[in-house]
Amino acid sequence: YLLERLSIVEGALGRITERAPARLVEQRDRLRASVQELAAGVAVDDQRLAQEIAILADRLDVHEELSRFASHNVAFRQTLARRDGEPVGKRLGFLLQEMLREANTTGSKSNDAVMLADVVTIKEELERIREQVENLE
């Protein structure tokens, strides 16, 4: 059950990873168009504008969050596969907290309906996993 749920999370994460670069370009282009519209007839330093757009694009980039999320998924699978008799429930709970944190940050940075739908799916599945993990030792 846990691995099935984790596979659903990974599928949604994969879709977000595929969508993220295009969404970043769309956001950058939309921002550039908005600034040009606002600055019509006003002298604007193109270099400064490019710098500001780059800073905003960096704030919208979810690559780091997705990378950390993927590493938490690997750690979760490895922990589930442990056969040394050590309790795994707490560790899995901590990993789920980190996954949820990355999902929340990704959602807040996304500003994209398609990506947000996948973030909601991830959060739903993480909650289902958490309910089951609470019963593990």
Describe every region a protein language model picked out.
Residues 1-137:
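N-terminal intrinsically disordered, cationic/polar leader segments
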